Regions:
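N-terminal signal-anchor module of multipass membrane proteins
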Residues: 1-28, 232-233, 245, 249, ...
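Transmembrane helix interruption/hinge and helix-loop junction motifs
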Residues: 8-16, 63-74, 148, 161-170, ...
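Hydrophobic, membrane-inserted alpha-helices
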Residues: 1-5, 53-63, 79-85, 137-141, ...
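Membrane-interface helix-loop-helix junctions at boundaries between adjacent transmembrane segments
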Residues: 39-50, 57-122
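Predominantly late transmembrane helices and immediately cytosolic-facing juxtamembrane segments
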Residues: 160, 164, 172-201
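C-terminal ends of transmembrane helices
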Residues: 30-40, 79-92, 139-148, 180-190, ...
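Alpha-helical transmembrane segments of multi-pass integral membrane proteins
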Residues: 83, 88-113, 124-146, 150-169, ...
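Hydrophobic core segments of alpha-helical transmembrane domains in multi-pass membrane proteins
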Residues: 16-26, 70-83, 154-158, 169-181, ...
């Protein structure tokens, strides 16, 4: 976080590149199917053909909707992100809302400027309501942290989004907290790095390459920033909705096979 802050102060373009690298490094954490077990845990599996096809179909639909109505899709993505991040925070679910809105307290104009560029919609008149909303969420998060005796973690989250620029703050949370937590949980079950690589690689490698290519194309001016962002949002959105739960209900409980066993 300090490094990103220093980079932003000394060289904003370098800070942006560093943040994009963090986003890319966090991509593999979502490259698995996660099905709930009877005891409430999540089993991680290599994506099946059915899951992959459904994922790609939903991503294509999301990208088409982004091209048609970018503001509506941006709003949907932010809502889905808040829910997704909140579900990954067992002690402080309000952290999900904070990750999405926290930067609006200190960096109101820069955050809205990002939303404006992506949605191609004028949003400056929402600056006061946006700041009030973010402040309300921050207070609620502090109260929740006090009630659950998790003040230190809440203070860390508040600091990240009040001290770092919006892109760096989200990138740091996404990689260092959200993605690494997922990998730690998987490692606790899988036990070895080799086993984790076999689990994550089939889906994460092509997505990682595609993400790097998209960032490069946008940097070189081959595609617009809103188009690149829409592609990234379309790829991420199916991971944030309960896709695995829907597929599980439609086909019944998943039956572990030798290649898929991940719990002992």
């Amino acid at each position: 976080g300090l490094a990103l802050g220093a980079l932003h102060a000394l060289s904003p373009p370098s800070a942006l590149i560093a943040a994009l690298v963090l986003f890319l490094l966090g991509v593999p954490h979502g490259a698995v199917e996660r099905h709930p077990t009877e005891d409430g845990r999540l089993q991680r599996y290599r994506p099946t053909l059915r899951y992959t096809a459904t994922y790609i179909l939903l991503a294509a639909l999301a990208f088409a909707l982004w091209l048609a109505t970018p503001l509506a899709m941006l709003a949907l993505f932010l809502i889905a992100s808040a829910i997704h991040f909140g579900e990954s925070e067992p002690r402080l679910p309000l952290a999900g809302l904070w990750v999405v809105a926290g930067s609006l307290i200190v960096f109101t104009e820069p955050t809205l400027a990002i939303f404006e560029e992506l949605s191609q919609t004028e949003l400056s008149h929402f600056s006061t309501p946006a700041r009030v909303l973010a402040l309300t969420i921050g207070i609620a998060l502090g109260v929740q942290a006090a009630l659950r005796r998790d003040i230190a973690y809440a203070a860390l989250l508040l600091g990240i989004f009040c001290l770092l620029d919006p892109v760096s703050a989200v990138a740091l949370y996404y990689f260092a907290i959200h993605s690494l937590r997922e990998w730690r949980e998987t490692h606790a079950v899988r036990g070895t790095i080799d086993s984790m690589m076999k689990l994550y690689a089939p889906f994460s490698v092509p997505v990682f390459i595609g993400g790097a290519a998209t960032i490069t194309a946008a940097y070189l001016g081959w595609i617009s920033t809103p188009t690149a962002a829409g592609f990234a949002i379309a790829i991420a959105l199916p991971h944030m909705v309960p896709l695995e739960r829907v597929l599980t209900r439609s086909r019944g409980p998943a039956r572990p096979t030798k290649a898929r066993t991940s719990a002992h």
